[in-house]
Amino acid sequence: MADERRQVHGAEYERAGAGYMEKRQLRAGAAGWVLLAGLGIAYVISGDYAGWNFGLAEGGWGGLLIATLLMAVMYSCMVLGLAELSSTLPVAGAGYAFARRALGPLGGFATGTAILIEYAIAPAAIVIFIGGYVESLDIFGIEAGWGLYLAFYAVFVGIHLYGVGEALKLMFVITAVAVVGLLVFVVAMVPEFDASNLTDIAATDAGGASDFIPLGIAGVLSAFVYGIWFFLAIEGVPLAAEETRDPKRDMPKGIIAGMLALLVFAALILTLAPGGAGAEALSGSDNPLPDALGIAHGEDAFVTEFVNYIGLAGLVASFFSIIYAYSRQLFALSRAGYLPRGLSVTSGRKTPAVALIVPGLIGFLLAAITEDGATMINIAVFGAALSYVLMTLSHIVLRYREPELERPYRTPGGVATTGVAFVLAIAAVVATFFVDEKAAGITAGVFAVALAYFWFYSRHRLVADAPEEEFEAIERAEAELAG
């Protein structure tokens, strides 16, 4: 390993040697824009089946509608910004890489850490929900517990270890099955819609309360977290950049197509589920779509049973896909030296084996020991919201700092678009404290420990060869030539 070190922006870089990057190669060309769109939908689709409805208890239907509309605007604006950033900087680091270019090593690591918290914790929460779902369906008498959690982690981490192309294609099929379930639900609920069902939660004496927003203005803010569920994790699509055939063209098309589909699903589910079954009836449901069908058509109706079983595919799709996401973010942070370098070594099949297994083991232990899916998903939401603030800020900073940077896709509206997302992301961070102070506190604690690790250790050991860091070297060389 080369001994030469160079200090840039308060961090120390070294050349890791010729063989370093050869041991850290992903399989290029595994995905086109259609698979990327499917990946984006897969990340999110479990949120259409469950979770969003708890916002009915926090803000009523009107409060959740307002929150969802605002979050839809935030995600849409952010996705347009990410489409530009991912075509401009098409590397596996994604959000970390964007912030690294705009905000320096500390900003890059902070963003990557927030994303990693989101993606490492979310599968642990989802596997708990899968366990509850399997038990409620009485599939072969299987009960929720550590054995089931271990089996799901082992199977789906194993598929990712086998190969990214195979994993993405299987993920696409599972996601397609889950989408069919949503479409069947929509067709079955359209004839049952009654607008009076949307506002059947009684108004309270909270400030600003009415029949439309029965829990007042505070209820709207509390519902933000649940409006996020319709879109949470779509921002992970750029993590596939190094495994995409033509990232400069495919990445914008894939992430935007995925977002458009999610907007349609959110509008249909939020309107038809409570509109057919009643907002109050679904406000505490663990399985809102089957419960809505049960109220409208009967618990023993074929359509109710069908969507109930298909709902498991939605949970599995998100679990499967987010494992992919955490491995790529961890891989990129490790490859660049922000986290231990051994975590980024790839296998002979060009999959980041260690980055798949280590967070999987941690997630399994969290699920088995705590069995507290609600707290963990709120931790994931808090991490996500922090990353949104930093990623949208990165887009704004890069537009002003590097206006001549080659941008194969340009965000419509420019910084005005991502500026809207930035403001709403700050509001989303604040909203997490209204819903779960414990989860927000845990996330902040983990974040602080990670930043301390960076400040006192890893910033002195960064790798100049990593693609996300080479942009810095190129920029510095150009500046020296110009000078």
Q: What is the predicted function of each stretch?
A:
Residues 1-54, 58-65, 75-76, 80, ...:
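Membrane-interface "cap" regions at the ends of multi-pass membrane proteins
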Residues 10, 23, 97-101, 106, ...:
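Helix-loop-helix connectors at the membrane interface of multi-pass transporters/channels
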Residues 22-26, 64-65, 141-147, 173-308:
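Helix-loop-helix junctions that connect adjacent transmembrane segments
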Residues 25, 170, 342-353, 388-439:
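C-terminal membrane-solvent junction of multi-pass transporters and transport-like membrane proteins
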Residues 51-58, 67, 76-153, 157-161, ...:
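Hydrophobic transmembrane alpha-helices that form the core helical bundles
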Residues 70, 378-379, 384, 413-483:
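A generic transmembrane alpha-helix motif of multi-pass inner-membrane proteins
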Residues 97, 104, 135-140, 204-207, ...:
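TM-loop-TM module centered on a large, flexible mid-protein loop between adjacent transmembrane helices
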Residues 131, 144-202, 255-260, 380-390, ...:
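Membrane-interface loop-to-helix entry segments
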